[in-house]
Protein backbone atom coordinates (compact mmCIF):
# COMPACT_ATOMS: atom_id res chain seq x y z
CA UNK A 1 0.00 0.00 0.00
CA UNK A 2 2.81 2.38 0.92
CA UNK A 3 4.58 1.66 -2.36
CA UNK A 4 1.41 2.23 -4.39
CA UNK A 5 0.61 5.47 -2.59
CA UNK A 6 4.21 6.66 -3.15
CA UNK A 7 3.91 6.11 -6.92
CA UNK A 8 0.49 7.76 -7.02
CA UNK A 9 1.90 10.83 -5.26
CA UNK A 10 4.84 11.01 -7.69
CA UNK A 11 2.47 10.62 -10.64
CA UNK A 12 0.27 13.48 -9.39
CA UNK A 13 3.26 15.78 -8.88
CA UNK A 14 4.50 15.02 -12.42
CA UNK A 15 1.06 15.87 -13.81
CA UNK A 16 1.09 19.18 -11.93
CA UNK A 17 4.50 20.06 -13.39
CA UNK A 18 3.41 18.95 -16.85
CA UNK A 19 0.18 20.98 -17.03
CA UNK A 20 1.77 24.45 -16.82
CA UNK A 21 4.20 23.47 -19.60
CA UNK A 22 1.33 22.46 -21.89
CA UNK A 23 -0.57 25.65 -21.08
CA UNK A 24 2.51 27.77 -21.80
CA UNK A 25 3.08 26.01 -25.12
CA UNK A 26 -0.58 26.44 -26.13
CA UNK A 27 -0.41 30.14 -25.18
CA UNK A 28 2.75 30.63 -27.24
CA UNK A 29 1.28 28.81 -30.26
CA UNK A 30 -1.86 30.97 -30.05
CA UNK A 31 0.30 34.11 -30.06
CA UNK A 32 2.27 32.90 -33.09
CA UNK A 33 -0.93 31.95 -34.94
CA UNK A 34 -2.57 35.30 -34.13
CA UNK A 35 0.53 37.18 -35.31
CA UNK A 36 0.65 35.18 -38.57
CA UNK A 37 -3.07 35.77 -39.19
CA UNK A 38 -2.66 39.50 -38.51
CA UNK A 39 0.27 39.67 -40.96
CA UNK A 40 -1.75 37.74 -43.56
CA UNK A 41 -4.80 40.02 -43.27
CA UNK A 42 -2.64 43.17 -43.21
CA UNK A 43 -1.18 42.29 -46.58
CA UNK A 44 -4.55 41.26 -48.02
CA UNK A 45 -6.16 44.56 -46.90
CA UNK A 46 -3.23 46.72 -48.01
CA UNK A 47 -2.66 45.13 -51.43
CA UNK A 48 -3.71 46.87 -54.65
CA UNK A 49 -4.11 45.81 -58.27
CA UNK A 50 -1.70 47.59 -60.61
CA UNK A 51 -0.94 47.37 -64.31
CA UNK A 52 2.68 46.39 -64.96
CA UNK A 53 4.94 47.28 -67.88
CA UNK A 54 6.81 43.99 -67.47
CA UNK A 55 7.18 40.97 -65.23
CA UNK A 56 9.92 38.47 -64.49
CA UNK A 57 8.98 35.73 -66.94
CA UNK A 58 11.36 33.27 -65.23
CA UNK A 59 8.99 33.29 -62.25
CA UNK A 60 6.04 32.25 -64.42
CA UNK A 61 5.39 28.54 -63.73
CA UNK A 62 2.76 28.25 -66.48
CA UNK A 63 4.13 30.00 -69.59
CA UNK A 64 7.75 31.12 -69.01
CA UNK A 65 8.43 30.93 -72.76
CA UNK A 66 6.26 34.03 -73.43
CA UNK A 67 8.37 37.19 -73.26
CA UNK A 68 7.26 40.64 -72.08
CA UNK A 69 6.87 41.80 -75.67
CA UNK A 70 4.20 39.12 -76.25
CA UNK A 71 2.50 39.96 -72.92
CA UNK A 72 2.25 43.68 -73.76
CA UNK A 73 1.50 43.74 -77.51
CA UNK A 74 -1.91 43.84 -79.25
CA UNK A 75 -3.71 45.23 -76.22
CA UNK A 76 -2.52 42.47 -73.89
CA UNK A 77 -2.01 43.42 -70.24
CA UNK A 78 0.00 42.35 -67.21
CA UNK A 79 -1.55 42.97 -63.78
CA UNK A 80 0.07 42.54 -60.41
CA UNK A 81 -0.96 42.65 -56.77
CA UNK A 82 1.30 45.19 -55.08
CA UNK A 83 1.94 45.48 -51.34
CA UNK A 84 4.64 47.67 -49.78
CA UNK A 85 6.24 48.33 -53.19
CA UNK A 86 6.57 44.61 -53.92
CA UNK A 87 4.64 42.53 -56.45
CA UNK A 88 3.24 39.39 -54.80
CA UNK A 89 1.04 37.95 -57.58
CA UNK A 90 0.84 38.36 -61.36
CA UNK A 91 -1.86 37.66 -63.94
CA UNK A 92 -1.51 38.13 -67.71
CA UNK A 93 -4.45 38.84 -70.04
CA UNK A 94 -5.34 38.99 -73.68
CA UNK A 95 -8.62 40.38 -75.01
CA UNK A 96 -10.50 38.42 -77.66
CA UNK A 97 -13.96 37.93 -79.13
CA UNK A 98 -13.72 34.11 -79.10
CA UNK A 99 -12.34 31.54 -76.64
CA UNK A 100 -8.88 30.26 -77.67
CA UNK A 101 -7.85 26.61 -77.32
CA UNK A 102 -4.07 27.17 -77.51
CA UNK A 103 -1.46 29.92 -77.09
CA UNK A 104 -1.18 30.22 -80.90
CA UNK A 105 -4.93 30.74 -81.15
CA UNK A 106 -4.76 33.23 -78.27
CA UNK A 107 -2.11 35.18 -80.18
CA UNK A 108 -4.13 35.15 -83.40
CA UNK A 109 -7.49 36.00 -81.77
CA UNK A 110 -6.07 38.81 -79.63
CA UNK A 111 -4.36 40.34 -82.70
CA UNK A 112 -7.65 40.13 -84.58
CA UNK A 113 -9.60 41.75 -81.71
CA UNK A 114 -6.95 44.48 -81.45
CA UNK A 115 -7.13 45.27 -85.17
CA UNK A 116 -10.94 45.36 -85.00
CA UNK A 117 -10.67 47.77 -82.06
CA UNK A 118 -9.12 50.46 -84.28
CA UNK A 119 -12.54 50.70 -85.93
CA UNK A 120 -14.40 50.63 -82.60
CA UNK A 121 -12.64 53.39 -80.67
CA UNK A 122 -9.97 51.26 -78.96
CA UNK A 123 -12.38 48.79 -77.32
CA UNK A 124 -10.35 45.57 -77.53
CA UNK A 125 -12.38 42.34 -77.38
CA UNK A 126 -15.35 41.32 -75.21
CA UNK A 127 -13.65 38.39 -73.46
CA UNK A 128 -10.75 38.75 -71.04
CA UNK A 129 -8.54 35.65 -71.35
CA UNK A 130 -6.31 35.00 -68.33
CA UNK A 131 -3.56 32.82 -69.75
CA UNK A 132 -1.18 32.75 -66.78
CA UNK A 133 -1.29 33.49 -63.06
CA UNK A 134 1.21 32.97 -60.26
CA UNK A 135 1.75 34.07 -56.70
CA UNK A 136 4.80 34.57 -54.51
CA UNK A 137 2.81 34.98 -51.30
CA UNK A 138 0.10 32.84 -49.73
CA UNK A 139 -3.34 34.08 -50.75
CA UNK A 140 -1.97 36.12 -53.67
CA UNK A 141 -3.48 33.98 -56.42
CA UNK A 142 -6.96 34.12 -54.93
CA UNK A 143 -6.63 37.86 -54.28
CA UNK A 144 -5.58 38.73 -57.83
CA UNK A 145 -8.49 36.70 -59.26
CA UNK A 146 -10.87 38.62 -56.97
CA UNK A 147 -9.39 42.04 -57.87
CA UNK A 148 -9.36 41.36 -61.61
CA UNK A 149 -12.94 40.10 -61.35
CA UNK A 150 -13.96 43.45 -59.79
CA UNK A 151 -12.17 45.35 -62.57
CA UNK A 152 -13.95 43.36 -65.28
CA UNK A 153 -17.34 43.89 -63.63
CA UNK A 154 -16.75 47.66 -63.81
CA UNK A 155 -15.66 47.63 -67.48
CA UNK A 156 -18.14 48.56 -70.19
CA UNK A 157 -16.96 46.28 -72.98
CA UNK A 158 -15.90 43.07 -71.17
CA UNK A 159 -18.61 40.54 -70.44
CA UNK A 160 -16.62 37.33 -69.82
CA UNK A 161 -13.56 36.23 -67.85
CA UNK A 162 -12.17 32.97 -69.23
CA UNK A 163 -8.85 31.21 -68.61
CA UNK A 164 -6.49 29.40 -70.93
CA UNK A 165 -5.07 26.96 -68.39
CA UNK A 166 -2.70 24.01 -68.68
CA UNK A 167 -4.11 20.48 -68.35
CA UNK A 168 -3.07 20.04 -64.72
CA UNK A 169 -4.86 19.08 -61.51
CA UNK A 170 -3.37 22.16 -59.88
CA UNK A 171 -5.05 24.48 -62.41
CA UNK A 172 -8.33 22.57 -62.04
CA UNK A 173 -8.27 22.81 -58.23
CA UNK A 174 -7.20 26.48 -58.20
CA UNK A 175 -9.92 27.74 -60.55
CA UNK A 176 -12.66 25.46 -59.18
CA UNK A 177 -11.85 26.58 -55.64
CA UNK A 178 -12.09 30.23 -56.73
CA UNK A 179 -15.56 29.79 -58.25
CA UNK A 180 -14.82 29.14 -61.93
CA UNK A 181 -16.60 26.53 -64.02
CA UNK A 182 -14.79 24.24 -66.48
CA UNK A 183 -16.29 25.01 -69.90
CA UNK A 184 -14.08 22.97 -72.24
CA UNK A 185 -11.08 20.66 -72.33
CA UNK A 186 -8.80 21.01 -75.35
CA UNK A 187 -5.83 19.03 -76.65
CA UNK A 188 -3.22 20.85 -74.51
CA UNK A 189 -5.30 23.30 -72.45
CA UNK A 190 -8.55 23.71 -70.55
CA UNK A 191 -10.85 26.73 -70.27
CA UNK A 192 -12.56 27.86 -67.08
CA UNK A 193 -15.08 30.68 -66.88
CA UNK A 194 -15.72 33.07 -64.01
CA UNK A 195 -19.30 34.33 -64.20
CA UNK A 196 -19.41 38.12 -64.51
CA UNK A 197 -22.79 39.43 -63.34
CA UNK A 198 -23.74 42.71 -65.01
What is the predicted function of each stretch?
Residues 128-140:
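A short, internal acetyl-CoA/4′-phosphopantetheine-binding micro-motif in the GNAT/acyltransferase core
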Residues 135, 162-173:
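Conserved beta-strand-loop-alpha-helix junction that forms the acyl-donor binding cleft
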Residues 2-52:
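Conserved N-terminal entry element of GNAT/NAT acetyltransferase domains
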Residues 176-186:
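Conserved acetyl-CoA-binding loop of GNAT-fold acetyltransferases
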Residues 188-198:
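C-terminal "cap" of GNAT-fold acetyltransferases
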Residues 92-128:
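Conserved acyl-donor/pantetheine-binding loop and adjacent beta-alpha core of acyl/acetyltransferases
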Residues 137-153:
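Conserved acetyl-CoA-binding loop-helix of GNAT-fold acetyltransferases
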Residues 68-84, 89, 94-103:
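A short helix-loop-beta-strand connector motif used in the catalytic cores of GNAT acetyltransferases and
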Amino acid sequence: KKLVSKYLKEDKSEKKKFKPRIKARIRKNKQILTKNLDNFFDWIKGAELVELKECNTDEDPVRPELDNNFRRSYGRKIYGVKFKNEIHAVMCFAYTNEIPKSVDELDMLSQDAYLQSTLRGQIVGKIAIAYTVWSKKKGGGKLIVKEVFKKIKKSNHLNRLVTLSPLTDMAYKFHSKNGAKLIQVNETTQNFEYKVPK
